[in-house]
Regions:
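Bacterial Sec-dependent N-terminal signal peptides
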Residues: 1-36
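Terminal presequence/propeptide segments associated with secretion/organelle targeting
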Residues: 29-728
Length: 728
């Protein structure tokens, strides 16, 4: 892609929107067992309902999902589009994970009001804190629109033409929903590798306020050390409230808004659970690749995962060093570090689990069975004889460039924040209404509040070195030629000059830059000019593998469909795609390896053990007042039958990223806790379900209520809840 063409096409806002949305993606990851699967609530078949009842489900299916009357799905929300949550009061209280609300807590924190360290409690509605960029989403209904979507395609279309036709129809169907009712959002998603399409109709609420957050010593206890691990003792929860207008309709933030009154409130149980108790999760899992070919898995391991491991490890080390030195930096960088390190450790664990559990061998065995079935089935042999060899060849063709793009995305698009600022500016729609332009600018200006130039410069130098060391010279963008010819190969000198001459390194400079310049002169800023150079290289690499990628998309779709035809008698569930899903199973212990037996719950006793074992480690530092409260043993009605305070528990529910904050219900639809993590031994779970070792980690609702009432002294929140206590 020619640089001049990029600059000349700057005024085509539609084109730039399409181009940069792809780049900016980098800124922002058959039921063979009764407990496997992320099921669509609106499409539960008889086999699934039967399996749930056999395991202990007591409530009828129409109480799980109904479009005619309030049901359990009406209490479950998508929280911000990246997590899940559950509505627990008539006045719109929402429980979600502490790590889901972490960014909001951080934005309200300062050195003087360190809510990350000390926690936050709103003792009145007036003290609840607004979060302008946060929303919750309720699912109203789902509808199969496969036939309508596929009518837009013809057999003679290329893969690119087919994709464009399908995307256009999906948008059209979704837009029809909001045109009929402006309070609704319609989204069509692809299922089963693009073989089916379903419409989901939602209602969004944009006024969501922070009500309660425990200190990070509770909500993040164990931090990176314990992340993805069991046994766990993390009180990973916080509380928000949904607000609406006086007619109970969605509304942007206003002091005149009132608490939202939901269709359905999830009841809470204090009865707890036992080994083998039924448990189901409801939430919004992000994405899985259960039907991906072995070739795709191998590419993921060596490309995206390895790039994330290598590059983020370097970047995070710089961040963490500075965060440990200064409280102001700790607060500024807390949220971005938390998000980055979460997926970094996930990638490490995923690659390790794929190897240890021999996932590739299992996939190849399934593919061998498919090959034989195709050869023995005349109707399939005619169409798919060369399917597997085509997959292998096309993945091989794009191997090196795909790997380079993974490192490119991590090193530059998701690396120095100055690059992110430049790309955001290039994506501004300057022809929009003034109100929208101002909103775009304000959103960018807000990012500077959590930005440190000195740290970002060090990150940039490290990213330049890391990328050069990991890819072939053919994949180096033009900036490396500049570094070598004008700066003698010295990355530090290049970065110093770049930041010294760019005006967008500070909010004041950005305002001055945008007020003075027109789009004609924007490329005069070296950071913006660099952004264009990176886009050119990005699309150059993308074009190199375009043909192979189109072929892979088609082959993977046909591979998915062929597997379902081969096992037509099996009950298949679709991969996760950020739509509401149900998973179910039982609470239970597990043995990950010889000599290790893990119980199905933990208690506060383990908190004291870890504090002692990890003395001096900030990941396990807990305030004396918290330890004193836990040591008192005054757990009241929140204690189990032995008088212990349970903290976390595990089930074999099938979850993934996005399920964080998902409600964990018993067979009566009563809240047991919130899902917040998976376990280390089954980090390959996005690719294959491992029934013997895969576990969903949840925080016990009784521990949550204990912390709210006893530590937060927020009994007014407890009084709002619908608590079922059969022990009385």
């Amino acid at each position: 892609m020619n640089r001049n063409k990029v600059i000349n096409s700057f005024f085509s806002r539609k084109r730039w929107g399409e181009v940069l949305c792809l780049v900016l993606l980098f800124l922002y990851p058959a039921s063979l067992h009764a407990d496997e699967g992320m099921w669509m609530l609106g499409n539960l078949n008889k086999e699934t309902r039967k399996a749930m009842k056999e395991l202990g489900l007591q409530m009828p299916a129409d109480r799980l999902y109904s479009t005619k009357r309030p049901s359990l799905k009406d209490a479950v929300v998508s929280f911000g589009g990246f997590c899940s949550g559950v509505v627990v009061s008539e006045d719109g209280l929402v429980f979600t994970n502490h790590h889901c609300g972490f960014s909001s807590i951080q934005q309200h924190s300062s050195v003087d009001h360190d809510y990350l360290k000390d926690g936050f409690v709103a003792h009145s509605r007036e003290e609840e804190l607004p979060n302008p960029e946060l929303y919750v989403r309720f699912l109203l209904r789902t509808e199969d629109v496969t036939r309508r979507v596929l009518k837009a395609t013809t057999p003679g279309m290329t893969e690119a033409e087919r994709g464009l036709a399908i995307d256009s129809m999906m948008i059209l169907i979704g837009d029809e929903v909001s045109k009929k009712d402006s309070t609704l959002v319609g989204i069509v998603d692809a299922y089963y590798g693009g073989n089916e399409f379903w419409l989901s109709v939602y209602r969004d609420f944009n006024d969501v306020r922070l009500v309660f957050a425990p200190p990070s010593s509770i909500g993040k206890f164990g931090w990176d050390t314990d992340n993805w691990m069991w046994p766990r003792h993390t009180g990973d929860f916080c509380v928000f409230r949904i607000y609406a207008d006086k007619e109970n309709r969605p509304a942007d933030y206003s002091p005149d808004n009132v608490p939202y009154h939901p269709e359905y409130v999830a009841p809470i149980t204090l009865d707890g659970y036992k080994e083998g108790s039924f448990c189901m999760t409801l939430g919004y899992p992000g994405s899985t690749e259960r039907y991906l070919s072995s070739f795709g898995i191998e590419e993921m391991m060596n490309g995206m995962n390895q790039a994330m491991i290598d590059v983020r490890g370097v970047k995070q080390a710089i961040w963490k060093r500075e965060m440990d030195r200064r409280d102001s930096i700790r607060i500024k960088y807390a949220s971005k570090y938390d998000e980055s390190s979460n997926y970094w450790k996930n990638s490490i664990g995923t690659n390790k689990a794929i190897r240890k559990l021999k996932v590739l061998d299992k996939k190849r065995q399934a593919e061998d069975a498919l090959r034989k079935w195709i050869q023995k089935t005349p109707s399939e042999r005619e169409k798919l004889l060369h399917l597997m060899s085509s997959l292998e060849l096309n993945y091989k063709d794009r191997k090196e460039v795909n790997r380079a793009m993974a490192y490119f995305g991590e090193s530059f698009i998701n690396g120095p924040e100055l690059v992110q600022f430049a790309l955001t500016i290039l994506n501004f729609d300057f022809e929009a209404e003034q109100k929208q332009v101002v909103a775009q600018l304000q959103k960018l200006l807000d990012k500077y509040a959590n930005y440190d130039v000195t740290i970002d410069k060090e990150v940039f130098v490290a990213m330049l070195k890391e990328y050069r060391s990991k890819v072939d010279q053919a994949y180096l963008p033009d900036l490396y030629q500049t570094i070598d010819t004008l700066y003698g190969g010295n990355e530090q000198m290049y970065v110093d000059s770049l930041y010294a001459h760019s005006e967008i390194t500070s909010p004041r400079g950005l305002k001055r830059f945008l007020e003075r310049d027109t789009t004609f002169h924007m490329v005069d800023d070296p950071a913006v000019s660099l952004g264009i150079d990176l886009i050119v290289k990005f699309f150059d690499m993308r074009s190199q593998m375009a043909e192979a990628s189109d072929n892979i998309e088609k082959d993977e779709r046909e591979f998915n469909a062929a597997m379902r035809r081969m096992y037509a008698d099996r009950n298949f569930y679709p991969d996760a795609n950020s739509t509401m899903r149900l998973s179910f199973g039982t609470i239970g212990s597990y043995s990950p390896y010889d000599g290790a037996d893990y119980d199905y719950y933990t208690t506060v006793k383990g908190i004291f053990e870890k504090v002692k074992e990890h003395s001096g480690d900030p990941d396990f530092a807990v305030q004396p007042e918290v330890l004193s409260l836990l040591a008192s043993g005054d757990f009241g009605r929140y204690a189990d039958e032995k008088g212990d305070m349970n903290v976390c528990f595990i089930s074999n529910n099938d979850i993934t990223g996005g399920n964080s904050g998902s409600a964990m219900f018993n067979g009566n639809g009563e809240l047991l806790g919130l899902a917040f993590d998976g376990n280390w031994e089954a980090m390959s779970s996005d690719i294959v379900f491992e029934p013997e070792v895969q576990r969903c980690i949840g925080v016990d609702v009784r521990y949550m209520l204990f912390i709210i009432e006893k530590f937060g002294k927020a009994s007014q929140l407890i009084q709002e809840l619908k608590i079922e206590d059969r022990k009385k």
